[in-house]
Amino acid sequence: MFRQINQQPMTLVEIAKLNSITNSTALFHLNLLQEGGIIEGRYLPGKKGKAIVYFVNFSGMLFKQANVINNQTKIFEQSVGVGEYLEADLKVAHVASQEKIYTLTNKLFSSDRFKAKLLWTDGGKVSYGFDNSFTFNSDIEEISFSLELCSEARFYRNDWKSDITFAVNNKELCTYTSLGDFGGIRGKLSPDWWGNENTQYGTLVTISITNDGTFLNSQKVSKTTLKDLDLNLGNKILFSIYNKPNAQHYGEFNLFGDCFGNHKQDILLVAKYTEK
């Protein structure tokens, strides 16, 4: 990416398209370059309003030692569909595939759930499993989860807040307040049959955990660090999403897969690590 940006400043969408990766994966790598002071992002006017354009900070660099470090650093990625949960405590649950709606209330583990590209519920808790084999004999530098989500109301309600909490291996990380159940404008990925009166899109949220703490969309929100998560215990990493029963805004939630909303991705785990 550095060489590409050095040749020509680009937006996140342009970088992702050029490298055939998702926007969230591109953003993960761009954030690493920004943290190192190698590139910077500036808001500039474009055809569809302002967008962040990434520029190289220096005209020339020597990377002899950096190349050694970069060769040792590895990236692990895994996507899990919104219906591929391992645990679910949901009183009411619905999912939509690319073709139709399925009601999963009282049958949460029906095979229909694997068709899900959108899940909405009246609250409760849902947990997803990710491979943790990369954590064995490794030093983990950062692990992040990104997903598109919003609140859940009848049809849609743009001002319906919901406090949505995230945990890893049952260790609470942080709570994100969704500002609404968004509709009125069709989602970029909404299937043709999906009614205009329904929820259309969410917000892309990224939760990152490092040795310095937990970050929500790049802002530090918790002192919980990697060592608190026991990532190498058992055979999986359990990522949980839920409304606390005593939440100030118990606004339920929608989880978007790669065929609904505005972001073509499922629930994505990205980890940065080095082998021992």
Label for each model-derived stretch:
Residues K117-D139, V221-T225:
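Short beta-strands within extracellular/lumenal beta-sheet-rich domains
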Residues G36-L44:
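A short, conserved structural fragment
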Residues Y156-V168:
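Short coil-to-beta strand junction motifs in C2/discoidin
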